[in-house]
Amino acid sequence: MTAGSDLDDFRGLLAKAFDERVVAWTAEAEAQERFPRQLIEHLGVCGVFDAKWATDARPDVGKLVELAFALGQLASAGIGVGVSLHDSAIAILRRFGKSDYLRDICDQAIRGAAVLCIGASEESGGSDLQIVETEIRSRDGGFEVRGVKKFVSLSPIADHIMVVARSVDHDPTSRHGNVAVVAVPAAQVSVQTPYRKVGAGPLDTAAVCIDTWVPADALVARAGTGLAAISWGLAHERMSIAGQIAASCQRAIGITLARMMSRRQFGQTLFEHQALRLRMADLQARVDLLRYALHGIAEQGRLELRTAAAVKVTAARLGEEVISECMHIFGGAGYLVDETTLGKWWRDMKLARVGGGTDEVLWELVAAGMTPDHDGYAAVVGASKA
């Protein structure tokens, strides 16, 4: 749990770091649909990642949430998710990277001198990382890594990729399990042409073809522990996404509320129409609850896989509803890309329900942790039969 003064200092640091340059880089990135590497470099130079991580192997959840709020205020899913992916790769290295080689990569990433990304999903299985086809095998005192990753965000600008692969040392014909994670220099892979996407334009995402050798020190998580390592990174990303959604929803509600108070229809402002006013009040109440939940999780001081899954899927579904309703209240203007940014926000928000784990994958994690009340059931059923 973060001490109050320390968290206040971090908020102050974020306020200084997220300056007019960050706003300008974000606007340019949205126009060009390219992620600005200088943004991560800037956050590193400003000490944002260093202050967030300090010397800890595990993240300060309070600072994780505050950084997510700052990213969400930019109202750019491409920028927010890109920074959080870099930071989530740091999370993997901080906890699982034990060699001096990996510690050096992590330190560079914290300083903003290196950009990190994660290569997990493939055409074969999407979120099912047990069946990844990228293979890792021992060779010449290191590891040979071969495979194709389909969705690798930030790969066009990254220096290192945290690659999820299966070890086939025990059985070259295996097709399941023995998942490992290895750090692969981006200079040693072939990054394909970035995809054209529905939204999140600045989040450069491309397929990556891997056929290379890396030293033994590049192994982040040995065979059999890779799922634990990537799950840890995903939990970090999911918490960040939830915080970004909370902040971006609040911004959308505030802008829509201003529209409602200035726009007149049928002799009244839109806000004076009860149906619209109460609809917004409902959304505001639920966004408030999301923000309170994030602060509550931060107070516990622990990053938990199921909690991160639960808050991310809940936030993503709420975010989609909030942006859709705000766009609706803007009427025809909300549908015009040259008049408002509501359409862009609407397209961006869809990514939240897919990236970092789909709704169904996250609900399965929540379901696995549910506890039945057998005694309570017996008492209720017994009472009804009495």
From Swiss-Prot:
Pathway: Siderophore biosynthesis; mycobactin biosynthesis
Protein family: Belongs to the acyl-CoA dehydrogenase family.
Positions of disulphide bridges: none
Protein name: Acyl-[acyl-carrier-protein] dehydrogenase MbtN
EC class of the enzyme, as a word: oxidoreductase
Keyword terms: FAD, Flavoprotein, Oxidoreductase
Signal peptide: none
Enzyme Commission number(s) of this protein: 1.3.99.-
InterPro entries in alphabetical order: Acyl-CoA_dehydrogenase, Acyl-CoA_Oxase/DH_mid-dom, Acyl-CoA_Oxase/DH_mid-dom_sf, AcylCo_DH-like_C, AcylCo_DH/oxidase_C, AcylCoA_DH/ox_N, AcylCoA_DH/ox_N_sf, AcylCoA_DH/oxidase_NM_dom_sf
Species per Swiss-Prot/TrEMBL record: Mycobacterium tuberculosis (strain ATCC 25618 / H37Rv)
GO biological process: catechol-containing siderophore biosynthetic process; fatty acid beta-oxidation using acyl-CoA dehydrogenase
UniProt GO MF annotations: acyl-CoA dehydrogenase activity; enoyl-[acyl-carrier-protein] reductase (NADPH) activity; flavin adenine dinucleotide binding
Function: Catalyzes the dehydrogenation at the alpha-beta position of ACP-bound acyl chains. This results in the introduction of a double bond in the lipidic chain, which is further transferred to the epsilon-amino group of lysine residue in the mycobactin core by MbtK.
Cofactor(s) required for function per UniProt: FAD
Pfam families per record: Acyl-CoA_dh_1 (PF00441), Acyl-CoA_dh_M (PF02770), Acyl-CoA_dh_N (PF02771)
Underlying gene: mbtN
Gene induction: Induced by iron starvation conditions. Transcriptionally repressed by IdeR and iron.
GO cellular component entries: cytoplasm
